[in-house]
């Protein structure tokens, strides 16, 4: 608990009751929030489904001022395993209307999550947050997308919030929270050696895959 609240504090969506939030050594309370938001990208667990909009607009809405090309949209979709040429799901390609309105295409929960992730790929922010947006996506596909995000985040800052510890392994720094407090931090290997909360959760999850 407390992980989503922490991510929203870091984005400046919440104001801390005590203490301060700094990014690059600067207190966010004295930072131009418009500038901060333009440099920040986030995909939350409770993402918005933009119905009555085309597939293309669903991706572009994350960065409306970015120069539009069909190739950029198609790339973001393909990195999240969505194919604009899938005639069954997207009969009009990038111009397919989504949602029940206007006889649009109705996506599954996993497809909506992939689309939300595609918006994150398209935005190309300096500071990215992924707050468990992949609960309806299988672990292997989730791991692939997170690793791709890690590539995009090279030289930038990315925060991934997840309960699937297999995905946490790709991080160069893991922070473990329990009851709203930070209880451990380190790399995957360091935390396993310490035999603390992280190691306990890792072993519990791993046991579910051992026959």
Residues covered by each model-derived region:
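Helix-to-loop junction immediately C-terminal to a conserved catalytic motif
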Residues: 11
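Conserved ABC transporter NBD signature motif
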Residues: 19-27, 36
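Conserved catalytic motifs of ABC-family nucleotide-binding domains
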Residues: 47-68
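ABC-fold ATPase nucleotide-binding domain signature/coupling loops
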Residues: 73, 83-115, 208-211
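A short, proline-enriched helix->beta-strand linker immediately N-terminal to the Walker B motif
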Residues: 122-126, 155
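Catalytic Walker B motif of ABC-type/P-loop ATPase nucleotide-binding domains
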Residues: 128-132
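Helix N-cap at the start of a conserved alpha-helix in ABC-type nucleotide-binding domains
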Residues: 139-141
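C-terminal portion of ABC ATPase nucleotide-binding domains
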Residues: 147, 154, 169-211
